[in-house]
């Protein structure tokens, strides 16, 4: 009877442990380094490239002003809703090498976090996410640039 009790206990433990949710290990999740805007500004001054992953419209209204700044939207707004830009990696790869030093930013740091994970998992080596995004950059009164559009006569 004693061995039957041990067998039942073992079987119960096996069933319980086999059905517990499994946590993902760090090997499956790319390691993302997030930096604040003070660190971002220092790295940009040292030669890092800034990749703004907001929409083109957001970018034109104002963006980080630095020597190497590119706009490649990570999310697109389509009639079906918000979708990941299917050409994101192709566009980034046409502008940057996988060994380039990149800082990614968006409005608040959420889109850029996802984009940073994507680039790291795609083989980019030195990628940083800017915490707080453009909002934090502006709040620190760091340099910004606004893309001026040509006004048409009827817009004057």
Swiss-Prot record:
Residues 44-146 form the Rhodanese domain. SMART domains: RHOD (SM00450). The active site is at 106 (cysteine persulfide intermediate). Coiled coil: none annotated. It holds the Pfam family Rhodanese. SUPFAM superfamilies: Rhodanese/Cell cycle control phosphatase. InterPro entries: Rhodanese-like_dom (IPR001763), Rhodanese-like_dom_sf (IPR036873), STR17/STR18/HARC1-like (IPR044684). PROSITE patterns: RHODANESE_3. One of its GO terms (molecular function) is catalytic activity. It comes from the Eukaryota. Gene3D superfamilies: Rhodanese-like domain (3.40.250.10). This is Rhodanese-like domain-containing protein 17. It comes from Arabidopsis thaliana.
């Amino acid at each position: 009877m004693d061995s039957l009790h041990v067998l039942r206990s073992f079987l119960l433990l096996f069933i319980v442990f086999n059905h517990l949710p499994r946590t993902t290990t760090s090997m499956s999740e790319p390691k993302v380094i997030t930096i604040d805007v003070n660190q971002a500004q220092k790295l940009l001054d040292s030669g890092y490239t800034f990749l703004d992953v907001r929409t083109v419209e957001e970018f034109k209204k104002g963006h980080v002003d630095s020597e190497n700044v590119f706009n490649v939207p990570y999310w697109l707004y389509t009639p079906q809703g918000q979708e990941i830009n299917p050409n994101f990696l192709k566009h980034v790869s046409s502008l940057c090498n996988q060994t380039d030093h990149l800082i990614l930013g968006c409005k608040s740091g959420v889109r850029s976090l996802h984009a940073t994970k994507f680039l790291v998992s795609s083989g980019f080596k030195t990628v940083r996410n800017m915490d707080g995004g453009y909002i934090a950059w502006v709040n620190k009164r760091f340099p910004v640039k606004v893309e001026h559009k040509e006004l048409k006569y009827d817009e004057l």
